Amino acid sequence: MTTLHPIIGVAANERRDAGDDMGHMAISYNPSGYIKAVQLVGGLPIMIPIGDPMNAKRYISMIDKLVLAGGQNVAPEFYGEVETIKSNDYNRERDAFEIALINEAIKQNKPIVGVCRGMQLVNVALGGSLNQ
């Protein structure tokens, strides 16, 4: 008898300072700890690269659960504030895309696991605020 493993979408991060060996191309990645954890509990992990928020519905329809990993700070404009602390540690494209994933996962009644930044982003997507 074959048991189907749940498909777990792990939202990717992006490294933009890849260096000369990659020709200054951005690299999409998931930290291996997230992938191993999903596998350890019997899930089949797939990476969801940062992209157009309009594609969130399609991505979420392909998975059983969504994992949002840690990473950069959430940009203040997503929780209704003006940036008071200047930082290069924002990825607004990622913020917008993952908020779309969260909203769509809620619409499709798919479970969401947020770790660190991921949990902060769930809070923001649901109308919450953060301290800068």
Across the structure, where does each feature detected by a protein language model lie?
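N-terminal beta1-alpha1 cap of cysteine-dependent amidohydrolase-like domains
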Residues: 1-115, 123-126, 131
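Catalytic nucleophile loop
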Residues: 119
